[in-house]
Amino acid sequence: MLDREGYRPNVGIILVNGKNEVFWGKRIREHAWQFPQGGIKYGESPVQAMYRELHEEVGLKPEHVRILGRTRDWLRYNVPDHFVRREWRGHYKGQKQIWFLLRLVGRDSDVCLRATQHPEFDAWRWSQYWVPLDAVIEFKRDVYTQALNELAVILFRRHHETRYLRQRVHGPRSTDSPSSETDGHAHIAG
C-alpha cells in the first residue's frame, strides 16, 4: 500500500529499558542493525501496526511495554533504487513512518526473535540511546535523527539530558559500534 507520493506507511519502534538504552536488532543473515519497523496494513491504525510489528519482530506483547510517546508527524526517507524491488520501481520512493517510544516493563527474557515463522532479526542488544545514529544504514540516518531527537524530549525530560540532542553535522558523535556498547553481549536468537 503506497500513498499518492509513492511512500509506504510504516511504523518505527524505539524500545527502551530501565536504563534508557535502546533495543537494537541485527537483521537476519546480515550485518545491518536497526530498530524494529514495519508496514501499516490496510485498515490498521499506526498503534495497531506498532503492536503487531512489536510482536512479529521482537516477540513482545502489549503487556510487556508502555507507550511513552510518538512522533507528531510522518517522517520520510527515500530508498535508493538498488534496494527497491523491480516490480515497485517507478512507483515506490520510500517509507513514511510514525515512530513510537516504548518502555519495556517486562523482562529481557520476554524478547523472542522467533515469535513468527519469518523472523527479522537474529540477534539483539541494548545500546546507548544515540549509538544507532552512527550505525544505521546511511539512507535511514536522517529519519533516525529526527525520531530520536523528537522522542528524547519525552524520554529525558525529567533528567534534563535534552542538551545532548544529536545534530546531524554539529552534534557530538559516538565512537561506539554495535559490538561494543553497554554490556558487550548480543542476544542471539536460537
From Swiss-Prot:
Which InterPro entries does the protein's record reference?
Answer: Nudix_hydrolase (IPR020476), NUDIX_hydrolase-like_dom_sf (IPR015797), NUDIX_hydrolase_CS (IPR020084), NUDIX_hydrolase_dom (IPR000086), RppH (IPR022927)
Superkingdom classification of source: Bacteria
| Molecular functions per Gene Ontology | pyrophosphatase activity
**Matches recorded under Pfam families:** NUDIX (PF00293)
Where is the Nudix hydrolase domain positioned along the sequence?
Answer: 6-149
Keywords in alphabetical order, please: Hydrolase
| Cofactor(s), by name | a divalent metal cation
Name the Gene3D superfamilies on file. Answer: Nucleoside Triphosphate Pyrophosphohydrolase
| EC annotation from Swiss-Prot or TrEMBL | 3.6.1.-
For the region Disordered, what residue ranges are annotated? 167-190
The family database entries (PROSITE patterns) matched by this protein are listed as: NUDIX, NUDIX_BOX
Q: Which family does it belong to?
A: Belongs to the Nudix hydrolase family. RppH subfamily.
Entry-linked NCBIfam families: PRK00714.1-2, PRK00714.1-4, PRK00714.1-5
Q: What is this protein called?
A: RNA pyrophosphohydrolase
Q: Which organism is it from?
A: Bordetella pertussis (strain Tohama I / ATCC BAA-589 / NCTC 13251)
What gene name is listed for this protein?
rppH
